[in-house]
């Protein structure tokens, strides 16, 4: 957050100069806000210019960024929280409090036609976004400030790792975060991206907040289902065919043992087990967590680094890694595909579709280059933010 505040003054000064010739809302044409290159729709109130600042409905921008929004009617205080950071603003007060520290703004939040309007540039910058103004088109462009990852290739690792579930869950395999943050709705649920990601994390993973997410990601990276597989594979080696048949005959869940397939996968991959089944889903958790507003972009990449390193150390191409993933998925799902072409299974075909449509994200050269970490944040730094 200190880095964000240090950049804020210069950024907002440049925007002030750019907007200085723009009239106020009552006398000016409409203003459009774009997030990650896509129009940010407004349903209840349109953006306008106030004191050379673009004012937007609070929910329009805050929810797109994955913020939780709180309102204290008694004090007229708006509270925005995202990824461990908190911003408080009071209606008609030009001082914001960012993690408790006062920051002077040259325009205050206001209420217009029963809608709380906030200064887009300040709020976006408080949460690590880059803001640009195009005076000719009267557009505000907000994007993730990815300069924090300058020189790192962790996003290039993350995209192919998370591409399978991005494809299956109506997302975008070539978009970090799996969904475009500005889209109106996702799939059949028609939920906003941040809400859809929170739903997935909660219903499928029992992850309801930042701490849950970070803890689960760390656990999955270094243990996960691969530990279960390797334990079962070791057990298979100790049992004779007669013992296997006796156990199966006495059990009502005999298909779950999958003796032959477990043995086959173990012999095929050795100590690697079903490593990619865990690592690839971990990338999904991290990207969902980013879009949900639980972690920042920089934190998401830091959390991916250990998984990307394990992947790079154990595999030499994306096709090899995805073959391991497919074996892991079918073992976990108890799909006995022994003797079948793994690439003709449902997810095998999905992988081929992804490669056909998003082939540029599958760069085998990464396995030669290796993992290039972030310049200013490590996974240990992220873990240190958890309660002791």
Regions found by a protein language model. Give the residues of each.
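Polar/charged low-complexity regulatory segments
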Residues: 147-297, 301-388
